[in-house]
């Protein structure tokens, strides 16, 4: 039954989860957190909202370098998700749509199935990737009513640990065309921590706060060299510079950008950091990872290289259907910069069109909802009976 299916986009940073008959997923931090202010308690998932002081928050992550390695942490988070404090339903006797990383290790896939079938007693599993679900949702959203079997598109998933470029030709992933860049939201937050700690004050233990700063003030420069000219003009520097008021967890629970000329009460007593080129040099790493010593190409070059591994007759449609998902796709200026750089790398007679949905974080989950409610969903589910008869190997035949 479609209304019994759980859809879980199990990301390294957040898990997007809900029933297929619900309109919106719950977005839950996929980690356990500990705070200095409450040493006796661990916060799981959205319980962090109950923490009075999130300074120096310590994270215990289920994912390491993009892969699910800490199963104790993951099971703790899943237990919370499926409790009354989460989505309020058990996995027992339900089908589940669950995502995994591209090119996932076999041992991790085996452990995932084992826990789902033996610990949570699910009826069946549909295992896929976030890129596949995004492609499925893209078809569902298509005004031309393209079918999955005729879809030619490129999915750029700017995730927490990695950025993946995944081409689809006639609805199937072109495995030899998949490209991975070891740069994502986590690396950007770490770089911003380094810059603020070096130039202003030590925030190396403040991942939670710095991640909020990144989300609030960072943007992608359309022309990086021109943007760096801010240092040659005081007027340009003032245009880019913002003062960010740091939280003190007493009067200010979450940091914010100070509005010049409109100070809030007691604002002058609050601790602030002044940010200028940090605002655009941090997201620049998505386009030039070598800036911090990661010897890999940026996203535009990865897309151009992925194109070379695809049939030439599909190139035109692939470039017309480039879909960008993931949290870091939300930086202002990301799309114009990517289009500009990619335009210079592909033939002039081919048009480039980029699409970023309104909600790139939840987009794959909505694709999972479409999959779970499709008429032939049951045909692709790996059931408890299949698992008992064939074990892990049988799912690869689906």
Curated annotation (Swiss-Prot):
Q: Which Gene3D superfamilies match?
A: 3.30.420.40, Actin, Chain A, domain 2, Actin, Chain A, domain 4
Keyword DNA-binding applies: no
Manganese found in the keyword field: no
Q: Name one GO biological process term.
A: transcription initiation-coupled chromatin remodeling
GO terms (molecular function) for this protein are: chromatin binding; nucleosome binding
Query: What InterPro entries is this protein classified in?
Result: Actin (IPR004000), ATPase_NBD (IPR043129)
Instruction: List the keywords (alphabetical).
Output: Cytoplasm, Cytoskeleton, Nucleus
Compartments in which it is found: Nucleus, Nucleoplasm; Cytoplasm, Cytoskeleton
Q: Which GO terms describe its cellular component?
A: chromatin; cytoplasm; cytoskeleton; nucleus; Swr1 complex
Family affiliation: Belongs to the actin family. ARP6 subfamily.
Name the PANTHER family on file: ACTIN
Q: What is this protein called?
A: Actin-related protein 6
The organism encoding this protein is Drosophila melanogaster (Fruit fly)
Gene giving rise to this polypeptide: Arp6
